């Protein structure tokens, strides 16, 4: 198993996690919005759940999958339908599975597979109808119940989904995916305490379930339990979740659940911004505005931010103990001296974004001239940075 476990029925349905909404802007040193707002609706992707997915079954030998089915045994047709389902050929699988059921309406495995195929196609009403009918006569079919629950969640029928999940968990308490999805459903119903309980049960059995830890942190944040939320955000951030890195930075920027530390805030926001989290970039931009005096903050705030950016730049050297610094040169310059242009460019961008004027000038020169044999002129990474810097008034505009 990997160092972190990802639960895949639902991908972080809370709006901040899925990108459906963004938090309020984050970034003066004294006032940073860190409380996520519950979305009016939860966007959930229509992806087949992990546990009910059928095994890959090769159909019995035949000249073609499209061979006539009229004379075939229902069990053979079921195997063919499952094989098509495993290959992602949902329309064909649906037709084949319906034929199996025409020949043998009591073939429970075919009806369960048909429900999964319909769900994967996005035909939620038909999937729910098939699976409910099946479970009325075969309530023991756990995978069919989990598929039904997933379809109900996708349809945002929270009470019905909750009932199916709780039934499944009563029979099999070790179903981590069902427990995780129950947390999603309870959150959607406004039951924050129940959602917290569900996510904690997942983590008690699988501490590496990083999505569950992040969702737990979000719900704790909504419940105004910062002292519990921040450690969960930090754990998810350290596991590599970009949105968690944003919230970790926000916690350090405001002192929510941890001592206030602008250097740590800058470090976490930088990591999140490099992975496309817009609120993190907004937070850094507002800190830069504060340091420049444009944000009309008190002089003490401006000085604190300037010092934090300087300390952040100094700590970047800790990752390169083999490099000897010459004077006040940027870390990126030292890397360039060693012919390590590939490493130098992202480091220079970090340093320039942290208000290093020498790094900024080096990037402008590198963009215009490049380095023969190492870095061509007009590097796209540098251009992207220079455009963002120009938008903040820290660089001349580029075409």
Residue ranges of each PLM-predicted region?
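TPR alpha-solenoid repeat register
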Residues: 76, 110, 144, 178, ...
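Short helix-capping/linker turns of helical repeat alpha-solenoids
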Residues: 72, 106, 140, 174, ...
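Hydrophobic face of amphipathic alpha-helices that form TPR/SEL1-like repeat modules
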Residues: 83, 117-118, 151-152, 185-186, ...
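Alpha-helical segment of the N-proximal tetratricopeptide repeat
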Residues: 70-103, 116, 120, 150, ...
